Amino acid sequence: MRALEVSEINAQIKSILESTFMDICVRGEISNVTIHTSGHIYLTLKDESSSVRCVMFKGNARNLKIKLEVGQSVLIMGSLSVYVPKGEYQILCKSITLAGLGELSQAYEALKTKLGAKGYFESAHKKPLPRFPKRIALLTSATGAAKEDMLKVAHKRWNLVHITLFNTLVQGEGAKDSIVENLKRADSFFGTSESFDVIVLGRGGGSMEDMWAFNEECVADAIYSARTPIISAVGHEVDVFISDFVADVRAPTPSAAMEILLPDKNEYLRVLDEIMNSYFYALKQQFVLKSQALERMREYFKLYNFEQRYCAKVEQINIFQQMMRDSMNAVLEDKMLKYEHIFLSLNARCEEKLQQCQYEYERMLEVFNALNPHSLSTRGYAQISKEGKPCRLSDIDINEEFYLSDMTHSILAKRLQ
């Protein structure tokens, strides 16, 4: 058997290890960690009985999403590398995540797929935000920095809004139940005089475990069932949670939620100032133009002696009015004379006609009196009647009875011949 040099055995070990362990996943606890000024990260990963050195170069370190601390339990994805001169090996880290995040990521993706199939993310279900909200329900921790950030931004942008804080657990045991309970409480005012225009669900950043309540199905159900528009403002811009997909609007940060929701009063004041300045400028321009037009008209009047011509026209009108009055008086006098003549003529004819009617009346009265039955009876005349009807003597047969009547008496008679 040929004896191998140390460098040869180390080289063979390097070849075997690096070709065999090209893609590995190792779980362990960080025992120490150093971030070099070059951007490289050096750490030691250990378990109860062993340890191994690890390095993450600058290129991969830029994509690291967690802050590495001693005592953290992590999962490292990478490959083995052997340093031949010293016969040492280490893990070249491609990614480092907190242990347990693999299971959480799988649960996250499974719930996301399930809710997507149920239509929880459909844009048709999204409710629009009010343009000028008056009442906001804020669901966050009363002691968290997120609350202070949101209130500060809200006061700066639109201090007319009324914000009601629902103190909510946003991490740890009971967080999901607290979120669901307060969502339902805030939404229960919908349709009343104390209803909220929008609900803001917010908290600052943190680890996936800390933020997991916003990936719970019961929270998604409560958001989807709410009648009040909801903004999900959870974590940082790079963090995306199930609540972000289900909510009507997703804000990248809690502060951004208030910027999205509330108008900027300073911007509105600036626009108002621009409108007022534009209005006054236009008014000033109109005033200048009208003043110039008035001055031109004044000069025009002077040029054509409008004042003298106006006075002459007034004098002509006065003369014409006098002529009209004189003419009307003459016509009126002529008409009055004609009327008086007609009246006298008509009066004479009426008197003549009245006398003629009086004469006719007296003549007819004499005839009437002569034919009056009472007058005839006084002269011995009587009326003949048969069966209650007046008749002539020639209408009565021989031996037929009839009545003779005057104004006071009536007797039965018989024709004898």
From Swiss-Prot:
GO terms for cellular component: cytoplasm; exodeoxyribonuclease VII complex. InterPro entries: Exonuc_VII_L, Exonuc_VII_lsu_C, OB-fold_nuc-bd_dom. It catalyses: Exonucleolytic cleavage in either 5'- to 3'- or 3'- to 5'-direction to yield nucleoside 5'-phosphates. One of its GO terms (molecular function) is nucleic acid binding. CDD domains: ExoVII_LU_OBF. One of its GO terms (biological process) is DNA catabolic process. Keywords: Cytoplasm, Exonuclease, Hydrolase, Nuclease. The keyword Oxidoreductase does not apply. Heterooligomer composed of large and small subunits. HAMAP family: Exonuc_7_L. Belongs to the XseA family. This is Exodeoxyribonuclease 7 large subunit. It comes from Helicobacter hepaticus (strain ATCC 51449 / 3B1). The gene is xseA.
